[in-house]
Amino acid sequence: MPRVPRSSLVRLAAPPDAVAAAAVERLGARPAGDGTYEVAAPPDEQPAIGLTLRLTPADDEGGGGTDVAITSTGEIDIPFFGWWFQPFVFIAHRRARAYAIETLRAALDGRHSPPPRKTVVGLPPVAFSPEQATFLATASAAVAVVSFAAALFGQLSGPISDSFGASDATIGVALALTRLGALFALFAIAIADRRGRRTSILVGVVGSAVVCALSALAPNLATFTAAQVLQRGLVGTTGTVAFLAVVEEAPEGARAYAASMLALAGGFGFSFSVVTLPLADMAPWTWRLPFALGGATILLAPAIARHLRETARYTALAARTDVVRGRVQDVFERHRRRFVLLGIVAFLTSVFSAPSSQFMNKYLTDIRGFSNTDIALFRTVTTAVPGLVGVLLGGRLAEARGRRPVAGIALALAAASQMIFFLSGGVVLWTMSAAAIFLAGAGGIALGTLDAELFPTEVRSTSNAMLYVVGVVGSASGLLLAGGLSDRLGGIGRSVALTGIGSFLVALIVVPMLPESAARSLDDVSPTQTTAEHDEYGPDP
């Protein structure tokens, strides 16, 4: 990415010598000749912004003033998502120049320097190495690709059921059956502890594209459902392993941030699936077009493979002979309490989140009279900005305030908001949807980060594979419950709202019982267990 300089010009009421002295004393500037001074870029910030100050006598009647031209340089150079960071980088540059100007004014007025400037929301709280940044961007690209494919069945369940002549109960069973893909995901995710994170991620990306193309050609609901079973497993593999990998690879103090960036990429893929909804209004068969687009994402696989490397933490662990990787009994013998608590949370939140997501469009069309185009507008308005802000704020708060309070409070409020959404109409429908998306984004980041942090590297994928299966069982249970009770309760909205009670209670009761991992190193939170009888780590508390 080109290093584009950015400039500000200000006039200070002091001679050049005084301004130069202030720049050297307060900003650590060094003379570069010809009235120019340079401020080195701080190595612990990203982007690392360097400043160049050019001082010239002011051309005014009174004389004695100085024109200061401040130029800032520094970029974030990453593949796939460099465009996303440009607005945040622009804000960071503007703040850096403004801070330098205010510091000079304070020095010339004999005041203390202003407090250090805050990190721009959306930029890393600590610096990533080039390798870490590239890894995060590439894993995020993989998740964006599979998230698009993962969202299609739920988003297009209405047109699909109409095309195949399926009832609410039948499509609910089909959606539930796709959760059988967890059996494949259980193996593919767990094997990442034995064969590495990179392999599992790439298998998911390529396989998801192939199965998406097969879904576009499915002649009947049975064939389509069978393809989606495999689709679900492949998507779950990539999403779960990529999430673990970015948390594993992130620098200390930025694990929740890395998780939030990956979640945003997943949200981008989901949003693109919403954009394709109007295609389903064109003809009874055009719901197949978004699945064809999903198949075309295989063209991105070579670029993802080229930039994706193995995590440094896993590479170091794989070289050791005193550690056994991927042993299931270690999860239950050494980390039983953590696994049980996280399993309860995964099950009960999935009981609500799955029917809430999968049946939302059907609820909007059947109960609220929305067309697919109306739904696309609704989801764009209530999902895009609230989801973006929620994920960004959640990652920041999870680092600053802790994982547990953010996860517990946000997820409880999200469940309550979504339940109200399925029981209301009019303005409340829109506001509750936006609130639920915002809160779920914030709470989900904090909770997901805990899933990755609370298990050591050698069983991180194995434990999360089992948690994934627990969540899938919860999803299937919720789909069957909501679909089966729809007619009895007078509509899909009421039956989905009923499934939210457990999610609300678990956020308030179980989440606070989890260990806190914020402001602790990953090795301190979940130290590696050696095979020695008396090792220096001991069992994880």
Regions found by a protein language model. Name each.
Residues G165, G196, L217-A222, P251, ...:
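Helix-breaking motifs and short loop linkers at transmembrane-helix boundaries and internal kinks
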